[in-house]
Design a protein with these regions (language model features):
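A short, N-terminal "cap"/entry segment at the start of jelly-roll beta-barrel domains
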Residues: 2-6, 15, 19-69, 110-112, ...
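Short beta-strand His + acidic residue motifs that chelate non-heme Fe in jelly-roll/DSBH
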Residues: 83, 102-103, 121, 126-132
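A short, acidic/glycine-rich surface segment
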Residues: 55-59, 78-82, 127-130
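Short acidic-glycine-tyrosine-enriched beta hairpin
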Residues: 75, 106-125
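A short beta-loop-beta micro-motif enriched in histidine and acidic residues
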Residues: 63-67, 79-95
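Short, surface-exposed beta-edge/turn micro-motifs
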Residues: 8, 12-13, 89-90
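Glycine- and acidic-residue-biased ligand/ion/polar-headgroup-sensing regions
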Residues: 88-107, 117
Length: 132
């Protein structure tokens, strides 16, 4: 059996993503630069498991030093994913249960994400998450 090509993988991924509910977004009147004073700088109550990955440099697209990862992250009540950047690695986050707040460099207020929703972490985003 032939391995799927990069295009097939990208198409399948886009179809799955298109069918998912979008997560909370920054209110239009709150889109603004946020210096994130007081941002969490250390993880707490977080289990991050990489379930699978694809080395994209070996695919037709030849994306050197890039991997497509499928991860499961569990954030305990009160747990935090510390401040980090998506300067060079976009991501999609799906909230499986509960609710979690995102504190973003692009929004003046916390963004609530609920179970069943997905959040897009786009290039240039700096943020941290907290399960309240």
């Amino acid at each position: 059996m032939k391995s799927p090509t990069f295009r097939q993988i990208a198409l399948a991924t886009s179809l799955v993503v298109a069918g998912l509910a979008h997560a909370g977004e920054c209110p239009a009147d709150k889109v603004a630069a946020n210096d994130l004073k007081g941002a969490a700088t250390a993880p707490g109550g977080v289990v991050d498991t990489e379930l699978a990955s694809i080395d994209l440099s070996k695919e037709n697209g030849k994306l050197d030093q890039r991997r497509l990862r499928l991860r499961q992250m569990t954030i305990a009540p009160g747990g935090v994913v510390p401040m980090h950047s998506h300067e060079d690695r976009p991501a999609l986050i799906m909230v499986n249960s509960g609710e979690v707040y995102e504190y973003s460099s692009k929004c003046a207020v916390p963004i609530l994400h609920k179970a069943g929703e997905t959040a897009r972490e786009s290039l240039g985003t700096k943020h941290w998450w907290k399960n309240t």
